[in-house]
């Protein structure tokens, strides 16, 4: 898939609703922060040096040995994309919101299936990311590590024997690894257990964020849980610790769902079918309303209240209904009211198409 196809297609591998524990865990991500020796960190990187870093990365990912190990990788400069197309990459979780600033200094490397992405000149020179559906942290780590090893054979990393990999943010020094899982936790929210859960996670040294990471709220009952510190821990320890916590959250969420199904079945059915009805027939719909209703419908699908709707379609609708993607599909900039109308139209069409498939 070319970059232009990537920003025109709501599909992404991590949206498939496959993989272990996929009824609760939407996706797993491993990200490695790396910097090139001999260059300032990106926040003080001039345009000339930024170009040199981009060129070095472009040359490295084109090497036959790396391509044979992990598949076809291609670097694109952010200036090759419109502002809307850059925002779509954020909406698909392929780049961070910070990448929208100073596009002339930045680039992104993508594999065709979007499982691998590398942000160039974001907070660090390289942010190697692997993103897979369900609970697949070990698989993400193995793939990200393969990319990292391949690049390290070509590029000199900034590394110190005592500290490990040197990074722009002190919390990333050491392994430079940030692992995270995205979870759908509607039952813990509905049973008002979520605050206690979040408090426990914080005490365990984990960070909880919303759908789009730092600074975002947990809309649609979607929560990102990640490690905070990398220094003093091995990569395997970080991954294993997060897997243990993720499985505990899966157990708690499923228990809460069973309790709701047993004790409040009529209320749950009403909530789910109301959400489905609004999504299928409403003529305007805000972004936040869409996220709430899609969460309710996904819960209904997972509980067996609604049948015939693949969970992956619900995840696809989350991306399809985001502001930049709406403008891309429409082929024009839309004001908020126009977006609400077009969002409702696209959702209706997609849900109605399921009955014809």
UniProtKB/Swiss-Prot annotation:
One of its GO terms (molecular function) is protein kinase activity. Its EC number is 2.7.14.1. It catalyses: L-arginyl-[protein] + ATP = N(omega)-phospho-L-arginyl-[protein] + ADP + H(+). Residues 24-256 form the Phosphagen kinase C-terminal domain. A motif (RDXXRA motif of the pArg binding pocket involved in allosteric regulation) lies at residues 339-344. CDD domains: bacterial_phosphagen_kinase (cd07930). It comes from the Bacteria. InterPro entries: Arg_Kinase, ATP-guanido_PTrfase, ATP-guanido_PTrfase_AS, ATP-guanido_PTrfase_cat, Gln_synth/guanido_kin_cat_dom. One of its GO terms (cellular component) is extracellular space. The keyword Zinc-finger does not apply. HAMAP family: Prot_Arg_kinase (MF_00602). Belongs to the ATP:guanido phosphotransferase family. This is Protein-arginine kinase. It comes from Desulforamulus reducens (strain ATCC BAA-1160 / DSM 100696 / MI-1).
């Amino acid at each position: 898939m070319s970059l232009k196809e990537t920003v025109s297609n709501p599909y992404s591998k991590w949206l498939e609703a496959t993989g272990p524990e996929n009824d609760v865990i939407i996706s797993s991500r491993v990200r490695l922060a790396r910097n090139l020796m001999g260059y300032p960190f990106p926040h003080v990187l001039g345009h000339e040096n930024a170009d040199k870093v981009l060129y070095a990365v472009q040359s490295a990912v084109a090497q036959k040995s790396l391509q044979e190990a992990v598949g076809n990788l291609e670097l694109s400069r952010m200036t090759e994309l419109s502002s809307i197309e850059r925002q779509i990459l954020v909406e698909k979780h392929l780049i961070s919101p910070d990448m929208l600033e100073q596009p002339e200094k930045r680039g992104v490397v993508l594999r065709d299936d979007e499982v691998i992405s590398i942000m160039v000149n974001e907070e660090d020179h390289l942010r190697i990311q692997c993103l897979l559906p369900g609970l697949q942290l070990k698989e993400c780590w193995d793939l990200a590590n393969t990319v990292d090893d391949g690049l390290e054979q070509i590029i000199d990393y900034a590394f110190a024997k005592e500290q490990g990999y040197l990074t722009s943010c002190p919390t990333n020094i050491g392994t430079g690894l940030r692992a995270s899982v995205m979870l759908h936790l509607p039952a813990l929210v509905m049973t008002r257990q979520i605050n206690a859960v979040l408090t426990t996670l914080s005490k365990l040294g984990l960070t909880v964020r919303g759908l789009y990471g730092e600074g975002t709220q947990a809309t649609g009952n979607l929560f990102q849980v990640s490690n905070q510190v990398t220094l003093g821990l091995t990569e395997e320890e970080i991954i294993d610790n997060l897997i243990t916590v993720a499985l505990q959250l899966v157990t708690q969420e499923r228990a809460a769902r069973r309790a709701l199904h047993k004790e409040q079945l009529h209320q749950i059915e009403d909530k789910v079918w109301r959400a489905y009805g609004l999504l299928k027939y409403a003529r305007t719909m805000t972004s936040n309303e869409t996220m709430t209703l899609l969460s309710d419908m996904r819960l209904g699908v997972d509980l067996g209240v609604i049948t015939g709707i693949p969970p992956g379609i619900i995840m696809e609708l989350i991306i399809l209904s985001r502001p930049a993607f709406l403008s891309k599909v429409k082929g024009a900039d839309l004001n908020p009211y126009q977006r609400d109308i077009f969002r409702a139209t696209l959702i209706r069409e997609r849900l109605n198409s399921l009955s014809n498939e």
